[in-house]
Amino acid sequence: VKIGMVCPYSFDVPGGVQAHVQQLAEVFIERGHRVSVLAPASEDVELPDFVVSAGEALAIPYNGSVARLRFGPVTYSRIRKWISDNDFDVLHIHEPNAPSLSMLALKAADGPIVATFHTSTTKSLVLSTFQGVLRPYHEKISGRIAVSELARRWQVESLGSDAVEIPNGVDVPAFADAAVLEGYPRPGRTVLFLGRFDEPRKGMAVLLGALPALVESHPDIEILIVGRGDEDKLRKEAGALASHLTFLGQVDDATKASAMRSADVYCAPNLGGESFGIVLVEAMAAGTPVVASELDAFRRVLRDGTCGLLVPIEDSDALAAAVTSILDDDAVRERLVDAASVAVSTYDWPVVAEQILRVYETVTLGGQKVRAST
C-alpha cells in the first residue's frame, strides 16, 4: 500500500501526535508499505527520510497548549503538489481539525481519506467559528479513527459522525528492555515527571505541593524531571527543597525510556487537556508504577485504578499519599506492575498498526487513488 500521511504539528519539537505519526510510518515501512509523511519542519531539523517538510511552522495557542502549525496559500500549493507527485492509495490525515496542514490537506485532496482524531477539545475558536465551512470537507473522510473514547465521543457530539476507536501505539519492547540511566538505581527513591513543566496543565505545581510530605517520609527522594521549561524558576518555587529536583531537559526517545526504567514511580498530576495518556502507557510498558490525576482519559488507560493509582485533580496531599503507598508497600507496587504488563499488549504497535490497516482496506476497496481536488 502506498500511504500518504499528514501531520499538522511541527517536527521541530517532540509531541504525542508527531511521535504517533512517525512510529506508525516506521511500522508500515518495516512491513513493506511505502509511506510519505508531510509535516511542518524547519530547514535545520534532521528528518527521517520518509518525512517531507512543508515549511517552517508558526507557534499559536491551541488546545490549552502552544502548537507549531503551518498554513496559508503557499502551504496549500505545496500540499497539492505533494499529492500530485505521489500515487497514494490512501491519504491518512491526523488531527483534521487542527488549523494547519491537516485542514488544508482535507480541502486539497479527493479519494480514499482516513482521518485520526487525537484530541477531544471543543474549545477551539477555529472550530467554533468555521464548523459550518469545514463540514463539507469532513464529508470527504471515508474512514474515521479516534484514539480514545473521549475523542470518539467528541466526534459524535460535535460533528455528528462516528469513528472506530483505535488507541495510540507504543513500542512496548523498547520501554520494557531499556537500560537504566547511568548512576541508577540510586540509593534513594526516584519519582519521574515528564512533560513541559512550566505549562500549568501538566500539573508541576501539584507535584511541588506534594514534595514536603514526600521528603518527610523519604528524605533522600529525587524528583527526576524530563522536559522543557525554566529550571531556575522552578528551583526558586521549590525553595529549600530544590536540591531534590534533578533536570534532564528535553531528551530523545531512548533516554526517555531509560528514565522511566530508572524511576520508582511515574507521576502524572495533569490538570486537563488530555484525550489519551500515551506517557502512562509508556511507563506501564517500562514496568514503572503510575500515579495519575483522575482525568477521564487517564482513568481509561489505567482501567479505573487497576493498572495505576488515581488521585483527585489538583490534590497535592492525595498525590503524596499515593506515591508514598507505592514506595512503602512492595505488594501494591507488584500488583500495579503486573496488571499494567498485561494491559499494555493492547497498545503494542504491531497490534495497533494491524487495526489501522483494516481501516485502510475498507476505504480502498474500489481501487480509487488519492488525487488533488479540482
What are these regions (language model features)?
Residues 183-202, 208-212, 224:
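Conserved donor-binding/catalytic core segment of Leloir-type glycosyltransferases
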Residues 150, 169:
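Carbohydrate-associated surface elements
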